[in-house]
């Protein structure tokens, strides 16, 4: 059986919002949610919601019950039938990859084919997308430079 391939569609404006949030804190990870829709093989990001009430550490970001409640409340303001299609988070000076904890979040909450995550390393100035496909999380494309200038050497 052929694997279903999805295209990720995210505007430069929304990418800038994601990067600005990820560049705002380099002592701990930050993150948020990607709202949008799945249309004809495309994962279309239409809104970004910064995660609130997280338990953040240098190498880990945890979404608490309050985090999810706040995200769903914000989604209801955007559109009553808004769809959560993914999430984003930073890896300050750790590179672009998914840790075991990140993979857990993706496979538990965003396991449906086409659900996405983007990782941003503000120190190294890199970002990369990952996508759920066939019960796995795989890199969507090669990592690329962020539009904001990296914060470290």
Walk through the language-model features, giving the residues of each.
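Conserved beta-strand-loop surface patch within small alpha/beta domains used
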Residues: 1-84, 93-153
